[in-house]
Regions:
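Catalytic cores of nucleotide-sugar-dependent glycosyltransferases that transfer UDP/GDP/TDP-activated
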Residues: 1-197
Length: 197
């Protein structure tokens, strides 16, 4: 419930004729380490960083008026994007006809998010039914929430969390198994085509 400035940085990849947008904030992302400090202690505000990132990405897409065909979320830092898109932003015309794909990686965070994480989501407008899924705000439950709100899933690492592997066997959604580096580009393109057809 605090205001933090959203900084959008733009870079170009000339050879691909592509622009890349970076979501930034001095308080959340100007650190020497990404998830944990040099002693391996996970940052206490990783929950707020994930919330800020999700809202920042979605608000940037809205501001630039990009109507996506596919929103591909990679890893737990983006896990709230599917939730927000399918709940808070579900009536926004920019997000009218698109698919969400969530890639799951072997990048578990080990500690739980802070105990008031559900309150932060409630403040953002996430309903009580969804908050039940994250009563224990850990990597597995936050990933399950992302899986629930995604249309398709990609296994991005050779091995992933064992509990998520079991959970995926119960999910009735298209799942692309892990692809070797030499094959993943074609496999992803085919998966995107399948999701859009």
């Amino acid at each position: 419930d605090t205001d933090r400035p959203l900084i959008i940085k733009v870079a170009s990849i000339q050879s691909a004729r592509m622009q890349v947008y970076f979501i930034d904030n001095d308080d959340y992302f100007q650190r020497k380490h990404v998830i944990a400090d040099s002693n391996g202690r996970e940052f206490e505000d990783n929950d707020e960083r994930a919330l800020f990132f999700a809202r920042g990405v979605i608000e940037t897409v809205k501001k630039l008026r990009w109507a996506p065909d596919i929103v591909h979320c990679h890893g737990w830092m983006s896990a709230l994007v599917p939730v927000y898109l399918r709940s808070i932003y579900s009536d926004d015309p920019i997000f009218n006809n698109f698919k969400v794909i969530y890639s799951i990686y072997d990048n578990d965070f080990k500690s739980q998010f802070r105990s008031n994480f559900a309150d932060k989501l409630r403040f953002d407008g996430i309903d009580a039914e969804n908050l039940k899924l994250i009563k224990k705000p850990d990597f597995v439950n936050i990933s399950k929430l992302a899986i629930k709100y995604s249309d398709g899933l990609i296994i991005g690492s050779e091995t992933i969390n064992e509990e998520l592997t079991k959970f995926l066997k119960t999910v009735k959604k298209p799942i692309l198994p892990y692809q070797d580096e030499s094959e993943y580009i074609d496999a992803y393109n085919n998966f995107y085509d399948e999701m859009l057809s």
